[in-house]
């Protein structure tokens, strides 16, 4: 059995690392919670009023709700792993955090991939029969595809609770110049099982997202070049919108890929538990959902207007409190 073992003692992490990780990842998580919570509140309120949400808004609601859950869970894991290590390194608690983290991340990756596929089919133009067929069927199929994504995420996440992660504790490590001992935690990861379940759960949405994002960028780029050849000028609002969409899609693609890599490295325990590389993975994993939630609000006219109204109401409330 191919395994990776890492170890950590109670005293091998400095206060600076604890503070830095909690502050940076905390800011990212809080930003993401506010962004995802805002999107969930907007679309959730419409759904609660009995309105039928368009397909794109339905995907956004599921994506933002799953991200809200993910960011709250990531914040909890960071707090427990850094401040309550005795509890966190109990085998059952450790496995619970890892399994739910993988499930929420897989769900997010699937929903983000479907959102990009949906926008690609709605916006891009390619003269291919398969593309036209998908364009016609996507609205009917999307609710079933979203449900299937949740089931797939479950089926490839919960098997990780068996024969993948194990934590051992050795309480008899002597401390130099002292008669006491300290606890040493050994984390063992079955890499064969992890690679299989992780890759099976992430491979399809990753390929879907990269393909949809690439096709969308190519289509927008082709249309932008066509507009430029017609001398519409770079100041034309349509061209600016296309260039902005290309930049936003490229930015999201980079975030998506980096998050997938960081998640795998974090789950595999390749790096020491409290090493700088492992902390970097935590920061990247927190930055992806936060960054994309902000991008979704800024890039969606309806959400942008709702956010400005929300800001205005908050300012009025604060002014009323100070009077």
Swiss-Prot record:
Membrane topology of this protein: Multi-pass membrane protein
Topology, Extracellular side: 1-14, 80-100, 163-190, 269-276
Coiled coil segments of this chain: none
A family per Pfam: TAS2R
Glycosylation sites: 170, 179
GO cellular component labels: plasma membrane
Segments passing through the bilayer: 15-35, 59-79, 101-121, 141-162, 191-211, 248-268, 277-297
GO molecular function, one term: bitter taste receptor activity
Matches recorded under InterPro entries: TAS2R
Topology, Cytoplasmic side: 36-58, 122-140, 212-247, 298-323
Domain of life: Eukaryota
Subcellular location: Membrane
The entry's keywords: G-protein coupled receptor, Glycoprotein, Membrane, Receptor, Sensory transduction, Taste, Transducer, Transmembrane, Transmembrane helix
Family that this chain belongs to: Belongs to the G-protein coupled receptor T2R family.
PANTHER family, alphabetized: TASTE RECEPTOR TYPE 2, TASTE RECEPTOR TYPE 2 MEMBER 40
Remaining remarks: Several bitter taste receptors are expressed in a single taste receptor cell.
Function field: Gustducin-coupled receptor implicated in the perception of bitter compounds in the oral cavity and the gastrointestinal tract. Signals through PLCB2 and the calcium-regulated cation channel TRPM5.
UniProt protein name: Taste receptor type 2 member 40
């Amino acid at each position: 059995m191919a395994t990776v073992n890492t170890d950590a003692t109670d005293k091998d992490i400095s206060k600076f690392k604890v503070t830095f990780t909690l502050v940076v990842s905390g800011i990212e998580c809080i930003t993401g919670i506010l962004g995802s919570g805002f999107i969930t509140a907007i679309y959730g309120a419409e759904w609660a009023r009995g309105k039928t949400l368009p397909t794109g808004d339905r995907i956004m609601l599921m994506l933002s709700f799953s991200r809200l859950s993910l960011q709250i869970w990531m914040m909890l894991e960071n707090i427990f792993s850094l401040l309550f290590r005795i509890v966190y390194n109990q085998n059952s608690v450790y496995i619970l955090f890892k399994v739910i983290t993988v499930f929420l991340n897989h769900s997010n990756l699937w929903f983000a991939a479907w959102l990009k596929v949906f926008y690609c089919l709605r916006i891009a133009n390619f003269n291919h029969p398969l593309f036209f067929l998908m364009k016609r069927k996507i609205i009917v199929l999307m609710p079933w595809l979203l449900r299937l994504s949740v089931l797939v995420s479950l089926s490839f996440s919960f098997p990780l609770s068996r024969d993948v992660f194990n934590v051992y504790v050795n309480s008899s490590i002597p401390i130099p110049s002292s008669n006491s001992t300290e606890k040493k935690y050994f984390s063992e990861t079955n890499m064969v099982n992890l690679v299989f379940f992780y890759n099976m759960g992430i491979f399809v949405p990753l390929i879907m997202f990269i393909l949809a994002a690439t096709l969308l960028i190519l289509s927008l780029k082709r249309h932008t070049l066509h507009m430029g050849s017609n001398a519409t000028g770079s100041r034309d609002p349509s061209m600016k919108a296309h260039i902005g969409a290309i930049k936003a899609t490229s930015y999201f693609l980079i975030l998506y890929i980096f998050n997938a890599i960081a998640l795998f490295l974090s789950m595999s325990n390749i790096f020491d538990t409290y090493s700088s590389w492992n902390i970097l993975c935590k920061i990247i994993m927190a930055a992806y959902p936060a960054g994309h939630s902000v991008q979704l609000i800024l890039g969606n006219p309806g959400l942008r207007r709702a956010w400005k109204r929300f800001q205005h109401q908050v300012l009025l409330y604060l002014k009323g409190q100070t009077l």
